[in-house]
Every structure is written in C-alpha cells, then in structure tokens.
A protein has these predicted regions:
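Extracellular ligand-binding/catalytic regions of CAZymes and related secreted enzymes
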Residues: 22-31, 46, 57, 82, ...
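Helical hinge/lid and interdomain linker segments adjacent to catalytic or ligand-binding clefts
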Residues: 22-24, 28, 32-132
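An acidic, glycine-rich "communication" segment
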Residues: 29, 125-228, 289-318
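Bacterial N-terminal signal peptides
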Residues: 4-15
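Structural detector of well-ordered beta-strand residues that form the stable sheet scaffold
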Residues: 119-123, 221, 247
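Active-site rim elements
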Residues: 38-41, 126, 167-170, 176-181, ...
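Signal peptide processing junction and immediate N-terminal pro/mature segment
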Residues: 16-21
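Short, solvent-exposed loop/turn segments at secondary-structure junctions
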Residues: 40-41, 96-97, 129-131, 198, ...
C-alpha cells in the first residue's frame, strides 16, 4: 500500500513541483506532442530542445520534432510531410518575419487548418505569432499576431480589465520594449491558471504591445502593464477555432546564443507551458501548481544548473 502511494505521489507532483532532476519515465498514456520548427529570428533549435525537455521531464508527454525546410529547395519542401493528426497537440515554433519567402507548402498549411478545426490543439509559442502574415486562416487561428498598424484589431485593457478593441489604422503596429520582470495578473479564470495567485512576477518577459488580428472567439487569460508606456496588454489568450483549442502567449523568448535563460528558468513559464499543453490535449488540467510559484513581489527561478532533464541541455537527441 505504501509503495502504491509513493508511486501515485511521484506521478501527481512531478519533477518540477518536487524540484527533482532527470527525465521521468514516459507513461503509457502520455500525451503525444509535435513541435514544428525550422526557421525563426529566434534560436528555434534551442527553443524546441528546452520545450521538449520541460514537457518530457514530467513523464506526461511524448514529444517529437518536425523541422520544416528553411530554403526554397523544391525537393525538400515537397517531401516535408508532418502528420499533425497523429498528435494531440502541435507546438508552432516557426517564424518567417526575417524572410517572408520562407513558408510551409500550401498543402501543409491546409492540413494544419483542418487539424485544428477538427479538434486538434495548437500552442503558438512566443514569436510564432510573428509568422505567416500572408496566411489569412493562420491569423484567424492565432487571434492576435505581430502585424502592421493597418491590419486587424489590437486589444488594450484598462485598470478594471475592460478590453478596448483598437481598429486598423489606430494605435500602433505590434512592437515590444526591453525585456523586464513583469507583474502578470489574471484577467479571466481558466483551467490553465486555476490555482495561480491573482498576480505574480515573471522573469525577463518580452511583452508584445498592440498584437493585432481578427481577435475572434478569443479569451484573454492574463495581462501585464508595459514598463515604458504604462499601458496594459494581453500576455496570453486562448482561441476556439472550430472544434480545436489554441493557446498563444508572449512568454517563451529565447534569443540566439541563449542556452537556458531566466525566462525559461522561470517556474511560472515552465508550469504554464505544461498546463497549457495538457489543456490543449484534454480540455482539463491536472498538473499541480508548484509551491515555489512566483508571487507579485518576487520571481521564482529554477537554479541555472537545474536543467530540465539533466545538466547537459544539448544532449537530448532531436
């Protein structure tokens, strides 16, 4: 009986909640996740690696990476064939803002649309909302993205969390200032943030100002006050697209040369990544909020040497 209770506690609380190191054994009921990467102005390889490690460390996820062709080579483009339907969640980690000629084949775009519309889960990871400005259904799927002043609606909140839809041509195009330790507050309760404090401080976040798009069937989960303008903008949001669930967030910045930056060591980011991915797959969240979750007064970080899955961040094969 005692052994059974210990096993149950291990799987209930997981490595992050307990501060344990090493990748947990993947359970037979693990959620299958596909990360799609291949090009970005951010370090997409290291981002995919860290996201995979954070998820697989829990023992709840089985993660695969599919790398899109990052050239115009027709053979590699036509041979790339990610099977979205084999996974409960797709994590989008491509960004072509630095070179808009880099696109997925139209057949792959259409399959992602059908996948989400039919009930698949999509996680739009940080700069992935910068991507594919010419793909109109992608804009509908993600709700808000990095777009020009002339396109789409931007959302801004007041001190009572009332949302103003700023129409095309007003306000600014999407931008951000320097990264800062932002105080995030809950705007709408949701299974992802259930059990979080009303306010908490996240480490080194890049807050997107004036993210723009159709903003249809969209619910803002949390927001933060910009350190320069004093204006309040969404941090993360969910979108219902057909039968599918979509989660997008400003959190998750990892720049070229970063290995395990404080933004990824931040316990709130890791917890939210895990809980959002579980929700996208199941519509429910069972992963616990760790005791070391940050407060409004202080960030909370895993130690620099406490790498998800072990000390060598580059040893996990892709």
């Amino acid at each position: 009986m005692r052994i059974g209770l210990l096993i149950f506690a291990f799987f209930l609380f997981g490595p992050l909640a307990q501060g344990q190191k090493g990748v947990s054994a993947v359970s037979k009921s693990a959620i299958r996740v596909l990360i799609v990467d291949g090009f970005s102005n951010h370090d997409w390889k290291q981002t995919s690696l860290m996201v995979r490690r954070i998820l697989e460390e829990t023992g709840r996820f089985e993660v695969t990476v599919s790398t899109a062709p990052n050239s115009a080579d027709s053979l590699s483009r036509t041979s790339w064939d990610p099977q979205f339907g084999e996974y409960a969640v797709v994590i989008q980690n491509c960004n072509n803002i630095q070179d808009t000629s880099l696109r997925w084949p139209r057949s792959v775009e259409q399959r992602l649309e059908a996948y989400v519309r039919g009930g698949g889960g999509l996680y739009v990871l940080h700069s992935a909302n910068n991507a594919f400005a010419r793909w109109l259904q992608y804009d509908t799927i993600i709700g808000l993205g990095w777009r020009s002043r002339s396109y789409g609606y931007a959302l801004q909140l007041d001190s009572a969390d009332r949302i103003t839809r700023i129409p095309p041509g007003q306000g600014e195009g999407t931008n951000h200032g320097a990264r800062f330790d932002a105080v995030i507050h809950i705007v709408n309760g949701h299974p992802i943030n259930q059990g979080y404090p009303q306010r908490w401080r996240t480490a080194s976040m890049e807050l997107y100002r004036y993210a723009r798009g159709p903003a249809e069937n969209l619910t803002v989960l949390s927001a933060a006050t910009d350190s320069v303008t004093g204006r309040i903008f969404p941090v993360d949001w969910v979108v219902q697209y057909g039968k599918g669930r979509v989660y997008a967030s400003s959190m998750g910045h990892l720049w070229k040369g970063d290995v395990y930056p404080v933004s990824y060591r931040s316990i709130d980011f890791q917890t939210t990544l895990i809980r959002a991915t579980e929700w996208l797959a199941t519509g429910k969240v069972t992963y616990p909020v760790p005791a070391k979750f940050p407060t409004a007064d202080a960030t909370s970080l895993r130690a620099e040497g406490d790498m998800p899955g072990g000390p060598d961040t580059r040893s996990l094969t892709r």
